[in-house]
């Protein structure tokens, strides 16, 4: 969760600086920041489906690795071809933004039901602290190396996540019993209970 907080907020908070230094117009900066969110929205159901059918750590590592590839591509094409840049911003968002949800689900897999709320609070706290630290760290790197370091930083942090995830897989088994992924809108408590009852029947 710390790694997720140390990467995803960097684009939202310092993306405008990166875009301006890369020579983007104001419209292009707006498109850049929009795509950095749209990809994550588009990924929720398909990535959630995969995370509920495979080891969540494998999904985390795979998505993080794909985020590294997108980051490397964005480093190469930045400022040269905005259309290609936009495609890979969308893809980066598609792979990187669901990491928060999957990491939270993975943590819940090893938690008792009575600790779910405490766990959620802890995860959000860790995410918030890492997001604050990432803003300070990345802005400091901007001062030293320039804004082009943004996706280098993001790629390195995702690499750390890949290595750590692979290490954790060697020392802790996966959770085998998983409920099938089911997408339904948020609604009233009464309807939610009826919905669960109908599914159990």
Tell where the protein language model's regions lie, with residue ranges:
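Transmembrane alpha-helical segments of major facilitator superfamily
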Residues: 32-40, 127
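Structural signature of the two symmetry-related core transmembrane helices
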Residues: 58-73, 155
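A membrane-interface helix-boundary motif in multi-pass transporters
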Residues: 140-158
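Intracellular juxtamembrane helix-capping segments at the cytosolic ends
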Residues: 97-111
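Loop-to-transmembrane helix entry/capping segments in MFS-fold secondary transporters
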Residues: 26-27, 111-123
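Helix-to-loop junctions at the C-terminal end of transmembrane segments
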Residues: 43-55, 142-143
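Helix-loop boundary and gating motifs at the non-cytosolic
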Residues: 5-25, 29
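Intrinsic disorder in cytosolic terminal tails and internal cytosolic loops
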Residues: 168-201
């Amino acid at each position: 969760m710390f790694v997720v907080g140390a990467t995803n907020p960097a684009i939202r908070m310092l993306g405008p600086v990166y875009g301006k230094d890369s020579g983007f117009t104001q419209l292009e900066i707006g498109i850049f920041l929009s795509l950095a969110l749209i990809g994550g929205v588009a990924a929720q159901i398909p990535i959630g489906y995969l995370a509920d059918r495979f080891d969540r750590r494998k999904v985390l590592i795979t998505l993080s690795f794909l985020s590294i590839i997108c980051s490397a591509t964005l480093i190469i094409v930045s400022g040269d071809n905005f259309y290609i840049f936009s495609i890979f911003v969308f893809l980066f968002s598609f792979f990187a933004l669901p990491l928060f949800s999957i990491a939270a689900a993975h943590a819940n897999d090893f938690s008792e039901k009575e600790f779910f709320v405490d766990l959620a609070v802890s995860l959000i706290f860790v995410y918030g602290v890492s997001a604050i630290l990432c803003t300070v760290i990345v802005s400091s790197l901007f001062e030293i190396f320039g804004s082009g370091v943004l996706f280098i930083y993001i790629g390195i942090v995702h690499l750390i996540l890949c290595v750590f995830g692979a290490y954790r897989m060697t020392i802790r088994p996966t959770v085998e019993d998983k409920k099938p992924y089911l997408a339904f809108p948020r609604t009233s408590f009464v309807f939610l209970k009826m919905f669960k009852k109908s599914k159990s029947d």
